[in-house]
């Protein structure tokens, strides 16, 4: 009997100990929750448990596995205790109430704080009945509050976290590119490196110049960019070529160009002068012929994939020589801050002089040089002397000759849209601008072969279709240049009746024939009439030949004026000031009108 009682007493003590551990666990849990709730700046689990959600199993909401085991043991002991006698249960309850009196008070205070209800007024339910329900209710309250805190923070924290991730990734990627740039530039500038290492470093930079991230980082560390041009070696042609390529790709970056000119304008001048004046000019692929195999392979791969020329040509850079690359570089800078410098003017005039012997040939080669030079000259008027105008005129004459030869071979009434055609248009625009701005330049153009080839183009393509935009645009530019010459030079007017374009046909004959075939095309016939009207009013020999056509000229000028008035209204609606040509048409129209009136009087 005594042993049985001792055993029962031992079981009761164990149960009391286990249940005490259960309630102590709850005290600790609720205290921890209150600490978290009293710290509004803290979030549940600090983003590390954002995906956590409340589950129905109370064990999963407990923070540590040892405590969970204690709770399980306590609950199991409670179950065993429910089968004991009433005396034993009474003794157990008395022992628990006595031993847990202090902790239960704290627990009530904690619960009343969490649930915001007057739980102090509720009667204490016996443990056997209340333990399961109260434990479930408490865990549910804890889980609900935890879920509320998580849901409240998850959207804001997700956004902040994603932003932080992107910023960190971008910063890391940016730093990686900056490190790469500095490494490559160090490879170029470090005196201890071999020439092969410097070439490979320059190629590494040049290959990535069309990578937006690379360019942005290179712009952001401008002092590193400038180091590429610290040293120029005129004798090292490949090194010079690669430096010019990098210069050309950054030509439209105004800030970089300004800094480069401020720091190393003499180096830039030496760099481009070296490329323009190099003799003999050879393709870049040949420059690496005698270099180590690694450099040779890298150069060949680079010039095939280089993107610099793809914006205006389908050809790779492999066939380009140094002067062509220098011309491309000047073309790229022709609309930026570099074009406003005296250095640009000096280099363009040097380029005209050195490219003239190459481009006057009609072999169809050096398209890069032709396109780049013509594009650079399209808005260029600061020619240093009439000699440069004569050379530009000679280049244009050679290209117009190519168009005529192609027509003779195919007998086609239209001009194909080729590099030669496009460059001829650019050169015509250049000469129109310079003729209208400088009478000396007008005289230089009038004495060149350009007018003769212009008449030949009008003769060969007099039957062109009005729908042929390519031929139409070229003809309008030719007529515009001839009109500028007759307005600026009376000597040129005298030549129109004398110069022989083909056997038995003078320039005046060609112009009259062209007018009669294209009278219905107002904007074409109008320019021809303006040229012929100047001849009629200023050359007695032309007067006799043109007199029968004056009435037609008068009507054509009237239509031409109305055409431009309508165009003027459209331009003024878009904010333009109108067209100066209208006043010129008015003067000629009035002069013809005066002649017709005087002729009627006679």
UniProtKB/Swiss-Prot annotation:
The gene is wpl1. Coiled coil: none annotated. It comes from the Eukaryota. This is Wings apart-like protein homolog 1. Residues 34-66 are annotated as: Disordered. GO terms for cellular component: nuclear chromosome; nucleus; Wpl/Pds5 cohesin loading/unloading complex. Belongs to the WAPL family. The keyword Cell division applies. InterPro entries: ARM-like (IPR011989), WAPL (IPR039874), WAPL_C (IPR022771). It is found in: Nucleus; Chromosome. It holds the Pfam family WAPL. Regulator of sister chromatid cohesion in mitosis which negatively regulates cohesin association with chromatin. Residues 54-66 have a biased composition (Polar residues). Residues 160-492 form the WAPL domain. The keyword Repeat does not apply. Keywords: Cell cycle, Cell division, Chromosome, Mitosis, Nucleus. It comes from Schizosaccharomyces pombe (strain 972 / ATCC 24843) (Fission yeast). Gene3D superfamilies: Leucine-rich Repeat Variant (1.25.10.10). GO terms for biological process: cell division; chromatin looping; homologous chromosome pairing at meiosis; mitotic sister chromatid cohesion. GO terms for molecular function: ATP hydrolysis activity; ATP-dependent protein binding; cohesin unloader activity; DNA binding.
């Amino acid at each position: 009997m005594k042993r049985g009682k001792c055993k029962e007493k031992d079981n009761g003590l164990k149960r009391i100990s286990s249940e005490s551990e259960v309630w102590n666990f709850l005290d600790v849990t609720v205290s921890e929750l209150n600490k978290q709730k009293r710290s509004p700046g803290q979030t549940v689990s600090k983003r590390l448990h954002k995906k956590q959600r409340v589950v129905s199993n109370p064990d999963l909401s407990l923070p540590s596995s040892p405590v969970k085991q204690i709770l399980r043991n306590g609950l199991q002991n409670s179950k065993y205790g429910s089968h004991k006698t009433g005396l034993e249960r009474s003794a157990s309850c008395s022992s628990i109430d006595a031993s847990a009196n202090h902790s239960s008070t704290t627990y009530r205070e904690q619960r009343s704080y969490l649930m915001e209800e007057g739980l102090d007024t509720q009667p204490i339910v016996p443990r056997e009945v209340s333990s399961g329900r109260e434990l479930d209710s408490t865990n549910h309250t804890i889980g609900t509050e935890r879920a509320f805190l998580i849901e409240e923070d998850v959207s804001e924290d997700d956004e902040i976290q994603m932003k932080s991730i992107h910023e960190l990734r971008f910063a890391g990627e940016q730093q990686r590119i900056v490190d790469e740039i500095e490494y490559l530039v160090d490879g170029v500038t470090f005196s201890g490196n071999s020439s092969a290492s410097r070439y490979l470093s320059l190629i590494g930079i040049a290959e990535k110049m069309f990578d937006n991230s690379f360019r942005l980082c290179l712009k952001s560390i401008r002092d590193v960019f400038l180091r590429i041009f610290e040293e120029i070696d005129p004798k090292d042609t490949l090194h010079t070529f690669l430096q010019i390529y990098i210069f050309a790709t950054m030509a439209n970056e105004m800030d970089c160009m300004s800094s480069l000119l401020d720091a190393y304008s003499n180096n830039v001048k030496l760099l481009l002068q070296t490329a323009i004046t190099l003799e003999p000019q050879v393709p870049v692929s040949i420059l690496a012929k005698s270099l180590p195999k690694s450099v040779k392979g890298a150069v060949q791969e680079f010039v095939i994939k280089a993107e610099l020329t793809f914006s205006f040509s389908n050809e790779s850079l492999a066939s380009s020589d140094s002067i062509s690359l220098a011309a491309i570089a000047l073309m790229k800078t022709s609309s930026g801050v570099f074009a406003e410098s005296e250095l640009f003017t000096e280099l363009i005039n040097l380029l005209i002089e050195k490219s003239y012997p190459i481009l006057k040939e009609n072999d169809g080669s050096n398209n890069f040089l032709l396109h780049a030079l013509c594009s650079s000259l399209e808005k260029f008027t600061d020619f240093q002397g009439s000699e440069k105008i004569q050379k530009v005129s000679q280049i244009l004459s050679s290209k117009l000759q190519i168009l005529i030869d192609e027509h003779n071979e195919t007998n086609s009434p239209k001009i194909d849209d080729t590099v030669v055609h496009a460059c001829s248009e650019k050169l015509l625009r250049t000469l129109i601008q310079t003729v209208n701005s400088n009478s000396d330049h007008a005289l230089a153009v009038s004495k060149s072969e350009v007018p003769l080839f212009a008449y030949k183009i009008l003769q060969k393509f007099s039957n062109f279709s009005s729908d042929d935009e390519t031929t139409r645009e070229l003809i309008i530019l030719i007529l515009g240049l001839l009109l500028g010459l007759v307005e600026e030079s009376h000597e040129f007017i005298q030549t129109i009746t004398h110069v022989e374009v083909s056997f038995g046909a003078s320039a005046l004959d060609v112009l009259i024939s062209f007018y009669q075939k294209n009278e219905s095309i107002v904007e074409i016939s109008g320019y021809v009439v303006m040229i012929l009207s100047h001849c009629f009013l200023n050359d007695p020999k032309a007067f006799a030949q043109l007199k029968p056509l004056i009435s037609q000229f008068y009507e054509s000028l009237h239509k031409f004026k109305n055409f431009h008035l309508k165009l003027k209204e459209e331009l003024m609606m878009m904010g333009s000031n109108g067209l100066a040509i209208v006043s010129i048409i008015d003067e000629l129209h009035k002069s013809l009108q005066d002649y017709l009136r005087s002729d009627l009087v006679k």
